[in-house]
Amino acid sequence: INIMRTIENIRRFRLSDTFIEPYKTAKVPWGPIGYITYKRTYSRRLSEFDPQATGTEEWHQTCRRVIEGMFNVQKQHVVMLGLCWNDQKAQTTAKDAYERLFNLKWTPPGRGLWMMGTKFVEEKTGAALFNCAFRSTKELATKGGYLFAWMMDALMVGIGVGFDTLGAGTLRIAEPTYTDDVHIIDDSREGWVRSVQVLLD
């Protein structure tokens, strides 16, 4: 038995299938283009969660992913800090949040609809949930490569990145001396981000 997997399962927050069942056939109060926009932009492929599944999520499934993801983040935070988690209270609050989300009385930011409750957020980074970020260039002379790599990483997960010009004039771009160094770039987001830092540093 994988102890870490068992602990992970104990800590995971879930809404019951019984609670979700009536929502499978309930009417969603979409506007004229709401459903099309949702399916195009926020509905994830079901194969991400079940390799045998085909197609994309329906609204009741997206709501479940988002609410369970949201409460998993909260529950993991509480457990990591050794605080008291009240599962009954969490279930009540989550059911209320689900009902309101399903009926479009509230929604998270679009990035929350798109990414919350996914393996990417759980296993790699929650940065994909962020709409915007900002970096100062004040330390460009000492952190140049890192700053640009950080911005590239953020941009590649869809974050809009703002910056100031406090570092203007602190670095000069010179023609590099020839080198026969070879850098193998992993064909992944992380690999390309690292390549930019290596190039600039």
For each feature predicted by the language model, list its residue ranges.
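Extended catalytic cores of very large enzyme megasubunits
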Residues: N2-D201
